Regions:
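Ferredoxin-type iron-sulfur electron-transfer modules and their immediate structural context
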Residues: 1-95, 114-133
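Flanking scaffold residues of small Cys/His-coordinated metal-binding clusters
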Residues: 73-77, 101-111
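Short linker/helix segments within small regulatory modules
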Residues: 93-103
Length: 133
């Protein structure tokens, strides 16, 4: 007998709302008691990707998505929902933002492979088998 599960009529990435429907949230700075800075939290995670190839790649057929769809239509949600700040945009050239993937920060939550507009990231199990499959 198969385990029971919820059945959904669409993939989760289809529920990501466009930027026109939302206002930015101004989060308070970490207090060092209940909330901590990113580097402290990454050290506590115990993940280590030193000298490993990236396990996060943009799907070949979706190379245009980060800069054209995610950034322009959705205000780059990957820069906010990723708890390890793996995704950021290099804004040196204002007219051509470039997605930078800091895979060494990844804590293997797989949110990016589930929630990103157009599901443009291919998430593979890192060397050593860390993270969900």
């Amino acid at each position: 007998m198969e385990p029971w599960t919820f059945h959904h009529s669409h993939v989760d990435s289809e529920t990501t709302g466009k930027k026109v429907a939302y206002q930015p949230i101004d989060y308070p700075k970490p207090d060092g008691v209940l909330s901590f800075d990113l580097l402290s939290n990454l050290a506590r995670s115990g993940t280590n990707h030193a000298d490993q190839p990236s396990h996060l790649r943009i799907k070949e057929e979706k190379k245009h998505v980060p800069e054209t769809i995610s950034m322009q239509e959705y205000a780059a949600p990957e820069t906010r929902f990723c708890p390890a700040r793996v995704y950021e945009y290099n804004m040196e050239n204002e007219n051509e933002p470039e997605l930078v993937i800091n895979s060494q920060n990844c804590v293997h939550c797989k949110c990016c492979s589930i929630k990103m507009p157009e599901e443009y990231i291919k998430w593979t199990v890192p060397e050593g088998g860390g993270g969900p499959a």
